[in-house]
């Protein structure tokens, strides 16, 4: 190992040892002795479409499965703003970057067992990520590897020893560590068939699978053999499926729920809940989620660039913030803007872009573009099918988009689809235009760019493709100088907006609610990464 590589490894090892110690004493600053026992009552907005997280693009299975599994590394549960500095060990005791961020070596814990009693080894890690990246020699295959593109830069995953794993990369990529810390990146048991894991969890996490009653609830129970001593504190967790928004809110206000789902509460709902139950703790957080419009560029009329641009110009972004989110959102383009994130375009620059200059000006231009394409008054009528999920948060967006389209002469019929049909339809590109919500695994450009905008990505639902943008995406991913990387990232966002790659309405503020007796459940600035629950306890 060279001197520079040794220095990186030494710093990294030091960091992981310190944070491993912190894992055992997260509560010291609070000055309270945790109480053991009790079942946390939480909620899901829909029945999980399945329990395999790597096949998923929805929080509806990530959230209830997070307590059941473990990652190599994870984001510190008590630090709400995630970064490389908040990544802590989980199944790995420590890690080391080598060869200028081309090789990432993990040294694994030796006292870990799967919930069925089998030992955890490096073979499980290699299996998980070979399947996730669809390696040619992978021993199994997901129905859909939802984030396959996260792992496109991984050349090989090696398991030279039972407790050592090496990720070999094609080029430097510091963000790989953050990807591995995401709630979308649990490690699976190599000895359990994927078909079985679609129905139940066999993990290494703090809670074991108890029961999944379809359409009703998912229940977990304490894992007495969890590898972190004295954890978890809870006896179990119950996630009750309540699909209707008003019924969920009523259950929270009545105290039948201890904590609300980290999604689906608008600012108006949060205000109403607080008024009804003044002791509720409600946190306003950005969770790296955007409401947006997806356009199928292979289907008329959206195969015409002028029509796509007209759609983007038609959207009144400030109107969306007020009417759909009741003030609980900020306007932004390709990445979460300040103050919620750190990578987005500045507000002064946004206001100079078409679609962000003011509703009246932009709608006039939208009508002109439609007319130039032969549509509108005196031309062909435009009737489209606007697809979306049956969830309230999606229907709110779809209704707004349909109204905005109507104002420029496009008549949209909303087609509702449940999640089990929605994601396969998008994967087949079996839609015309969609009202969509996109949430990133963490606040880093790689989390958004690779899966949503790279040519050929499975979650690039519009089939947007610009080879120059692809080149810039790869370039920013391996840039180690933060200022230089930010410059590249801002340029990519400008190009995405110019190309109408995925018209953004805005970036959501979420309102996370729980009662004061719920301790150590801290919402993060990414939706998927704080549901492990090993440190949560009930003060009652």
Where would I find each of the regions flagged by the language model?
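Extracytoplasmic/peripheral linker and loop segments enriched in polar/acidic and small residues
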Residues: 33, 102, 306, 321, ...
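N-terminal lobe/hinge region of extracytoplasmic solute-binding protein
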Residues: 43-99, 130, 200-202
């Amino acid at each position: 190992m060279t001197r520079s590589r040794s220095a990186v490894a030494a710093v990294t090892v030091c960091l992981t040892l310190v944070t491993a110690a912190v894992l055992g004493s997260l509560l010291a600053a609070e000055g309270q002795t945790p109480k053991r026992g009790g079942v946390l009552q939480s909620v899901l907005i829909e029945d999980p479409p399945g329990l395999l997280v790597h096949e998923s693009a929805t929080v509806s299975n990530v959230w209830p499965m997070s307590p059941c599994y473990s990652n190599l590394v994870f984001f510190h549960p008590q630090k709400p703003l995630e970064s490389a500095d908040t990544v802590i060990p989980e199944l790995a005791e420590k890690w080391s970057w080598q060869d200028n961020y081309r090789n990432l070596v993990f040294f694994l814990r030796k006292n870990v067992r799967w919930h069925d009693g089998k030992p955890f080894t490096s073979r499980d890690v290699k299996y998980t990520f070979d399947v996730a990246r669809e390696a040619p020699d992978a021993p199994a295959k997901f129905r859909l590897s939802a984030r396959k593109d996260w792992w496109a830069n991984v050349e090989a995953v090696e398991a030279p020893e039972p407790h050592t794993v090496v990720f070999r990369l094609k080029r430097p990529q510091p963000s790989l560590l953050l990807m591995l810390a995401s709630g979308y990146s649990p490690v699976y048991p190599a000895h359990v068939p994927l078909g079985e894991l679609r129905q139940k969890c066999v993990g290494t996490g703090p809670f074991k699978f108890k029961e999944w009653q379809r359409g009703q609830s998912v229940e977990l129970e304490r894992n007495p053999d969890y590898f972190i001593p004295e954890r978890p504190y809870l006896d179990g967790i119950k996630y009750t499926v309540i699909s209707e928004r008003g019924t969920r809110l009523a259950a929270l206000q009545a105290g039948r729920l201890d904590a609300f789902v980290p999604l689906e509460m608008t600012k108006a709902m949060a205000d109403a809940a607080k008024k009804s139950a003044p002791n509720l703790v409600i946190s306003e957080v950005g969770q790296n989620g955007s409401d947006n419009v997806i356009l199928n560029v292979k289907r008329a009329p959206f195969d015409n660039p002028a029509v796509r641009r007209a759609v983007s110009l038609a959207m009144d972004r400030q109107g969306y913030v007020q009417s759909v989110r009741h003030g609980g959102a900020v306007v932004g383009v390709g990445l979460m803007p300040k103050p919620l994130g750190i990578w987005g375009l500045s507000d002064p620059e946004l206001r100079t872009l078409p679609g962000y200059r003011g509703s009246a000006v932009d709608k006039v231009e939208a009508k002109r573009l439609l007319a130039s394409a032969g549509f509108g008054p005196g031309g062909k009528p435009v009737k489209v099918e606007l697809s979306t999920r049956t969830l309230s948060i999606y229907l709110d967006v779809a209704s707004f988009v349909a109204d905005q389209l109507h104002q420029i002469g496009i008549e949209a019929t909303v087609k509702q689809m449940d999640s089990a049909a929605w994601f396969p339809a998008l994967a087949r590109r079996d839609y015309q235009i969609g009202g969509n919500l996109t949430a990133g695994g963490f606040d880093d450009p790689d989390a958004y760019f690779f899966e949503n905008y790279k040519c050929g990505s499975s979650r690039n639902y519009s089939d947007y493709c610009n080879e120059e943008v692809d080149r810039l995406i790869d370039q920013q991913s391996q840039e180690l100088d933060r200022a230089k990387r930010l410059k590249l990232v801002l340029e990519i966002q400008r190009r995405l907006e110019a190309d109408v790659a995925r018209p953004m309405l805005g970036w959501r503020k979420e309102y996370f609610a729980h009662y004061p007796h719920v301790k150590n459940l801290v919402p993060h600035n990414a939706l998927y990464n704080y549901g492990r629950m090993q440190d949560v306890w009930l003060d009652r």
